[in-house]
């Protein structure tokens, strides 16, 4: 039996056998906060420059739905697959007008940071005004909440069957600083980033949320945008996957603080279910096993949409720019544009993390839509696989 067939068999047993002692998930809505890995169309609606953002134009959205939506990919994101798995419609962005928010709202904004702009500016890190940071997204949520309930009790009742996803967020706080700040300088303010996310999680619970997923950040040393800065790192900094160890170690440090903060919150709010989603190891597993899962073995660190250099990435000629080509088959690529990933990659990461999330929420798999039966990405990733 081939490796990919074995992976698919193991995952199918996990998902479709069900957890007989679990409870049916009662979710009727999802609320998402985050950055470009979750934004389904907010940034492109933010004046004055949002409509000029690359994700507002083709080839973004070419795989799904066939036209740009503001998603930073050729198609769906992890949040889309989570919604589908829970039998809920895809989330509409908060800034989209004349749409239904009956089943939740997406407040995520591409480029958003966990820390406020003033904090980063004081440390010499410049962030555009257009990118709504985490506290601004929380303000949007408060405004929205005020439109559907008027008392704490009523709000708690409205949110009792809601799932909150906070992130991933925080990698932009690092990306905007790099390479103008050293790894040591960035590492020094990572605790402030994780504290900001923990405080946002605390606020969501105080406002009535009872089930919150907080994903860790991905291995930032594996994305083409950062690999393009290879000259800033000493020789030998690459690991066996070709990723930058210094940056990935920063992700590991970041995620360790995340998990510590969430453990403290679980003690502070014993009535809430707070889940850490291990995006880091999901992406590492995908990069390591990409060829067995359908990715082209020569393109694991290369962009599908891009041009130039060893990673098919040029920061001065972004995806969507005139003359920048797109690969003929995005399902064979993990990386989309140098910073973001393809729909096929997001699907596989979703397949990795969703079973663990559902188990932690004490839900039955029998209520989970088998999205992985559709289209590409049918090979599955084992739950909690470690290198």
From Swiss-Prot:
Catalytic residues, per the record, are: 36, 337, 340
Entry keyword Glycoprotein: yes
Q: Enumerate the glycosylated residues.
A: 98, 180, 199, 249, 296
Give GO terms: molecular function aspect only.
acetylajmaline esterase activity
Q: How does activity depend on temperature?
A: Optimum temperature is 53 degrees Celsius.
Coiled coil where?
Answer: none
Q: List UniProt keywords, sorted A-Z.
A: Alkaloid metabolism, Glycoprotein, Hydrolase, Signal
Q: Which family does it belong to?
A: Belongs to the 'GDSL' lipolytic enzyme family.
Q: In which pathway does it act?
A: Alkaloid biosynthesis; ajmaline biosynthesis
- Gene Ontology process terms (BP): alkaloid metabolic process
Q: According to the UniProt record heading this chain, what is the dependence of activity on pH?
A: Optimum pH is 8.0. Half maximum activity is seen at pH 6.5 and 9.8.
Looking up InterPro entries in the UniProt record yields: GDSL, SGNH_hydro_sf, SGNH_plant_lipase-like
Q: Which Gene3D superfamilies match?
A: SGNH hydrolase (3.40.50.1110)
KW Protein transport (keyword) present: no
Outline what the protein does: Acetylesterase involved in the biosynthesis of ajmaline-type monoterpenoid indole alkaloids (MIAs) natural products, important plant-derived pharmaceuticals used in the therapy of heart disorders. Deacetylates 17-O-acetylajmaline and 17-O-acetylnorajmaline to produce ajmaline and norajmaline, but is inactive toward other acetylated alkaloids.
Q: What reaction is this protein's catalytic activity? A: 17-O-acetylajmaline + H2O = ajmaline + acetate + H(+); 17-O-acetylnorajmaline + H2O = norajmaline + acetate + H(+)
Q: Could you identify this protein by its name?
A: Acetylajmalan esterase
Please state the span of the N-terminal signal peptide per the UniProt entry: 1-22
Known EC number: 3.1.1.80
